[in-house]
């Protein structure tokens, strides 16, 4: 924690970084109508638990991974609504009501205030208890024709962020897109190909 809060000297920080493990937070389901986000958690856990290849074993040995469903109540409400009609052709995810009195389906719009218990709990884990180096929020929506949107995002970036955070995000995005290119997997949107800006991401 002292390392994450920059409460130590540079020499102590380097020593701790050498002996510690990076923490990666992967969540899904924040927007309960984006079903892939929650379902990928199950698939990701299965892949990590069942594979024995060198890369997976190295990840499990060197990284602490937190897999978190961040809106199970919303998912249950959406699931119940979707399964309500017995005739499958009449099922849809266009739930007619906002199912949270204050923030609707969109719990992540509360993170700047932390008014709701859900966002307060997540913020406590991310910024007090665990302080992961990577926080990956899996959503489902993105520009038409894309599979995933990620950094680098379009400018301008938020002036309250240290520029090293932005270049660090860009480096993660570069590693992601390079890996996808190596595996011949198109569909990664970035910069102006995405609707997301660096102001919020």
Where are the model-predicted features located?
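Structured catalytic cores of large enzymes
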Residues: 12-14, 44-56, 105-113, 134
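Soluble metallo-hydrolase cores and metallopeptidase-like ectodomains found primarily
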Residues: 1-26
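Extracellular/periplasmic catalytic domains that process cell-envelope and extracellular macromolecules
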Residues: 16-20, 57-61, 98-100, 128-129
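Short helix-loop-beta-strand segments that form the rim/entrance of peptidase-like active sites
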Residues: 19-23, 27, 37-78
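Conserved phosphate/anionic-ligand binding catalytic regions in large, soluble enzymes, centered on
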Residues: 31
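Metallocarboxypeptidase
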Residues: 65, 70, 79-201
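Conserved protein kinase catalytic core
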Residues: 35, 74, 143-145
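Phosphate/oxyanion-binding active-site loops and adjacent basic polyanion-contact surfaces
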Residues: 34-40, 114-118
């Amino acid at each position: 924690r002292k390392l994450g809060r920059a409460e130590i000297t540079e020499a102590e920080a380097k020593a701790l970084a050498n002996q510690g493990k990076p923490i990666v937070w992967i969540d899904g389901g924040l927007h309960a109508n984006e079903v892939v986000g929650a379902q990928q958690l199950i698939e990701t856990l299965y892949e990590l638990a069942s594979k024995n290849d060198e890369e997976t074993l190295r990840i499990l040995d060197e990284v602490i991974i937190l897999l978190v469903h961040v809106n199970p109540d919303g998912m249950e409400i959406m699931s119940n609504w979707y399964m309500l009609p017995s005739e499958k052709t009449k099922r849809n995810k266009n739930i007619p009501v906002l199912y949270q009195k204050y923030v609707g389906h969109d719990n992540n719009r509360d993170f700047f205030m932390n008014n709701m218990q859900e966002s307060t709990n997540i913020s406590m884990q991310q910024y007090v208890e665990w302080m992961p180096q990577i926080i990956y929020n899996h959503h489902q929506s993105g520009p038409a024709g894309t599979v995933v949107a990620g950094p680098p995002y379009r400018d301008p970036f938020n002036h309250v962020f240290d520029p090293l955070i932005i270049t660090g995000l860009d480096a993660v995005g570069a590693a992601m897109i390079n890996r996808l290119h190596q595996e011949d997997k198109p569909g990664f949107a970035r910069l102006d190909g995405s609707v997301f800006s660096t102001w919020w991401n």
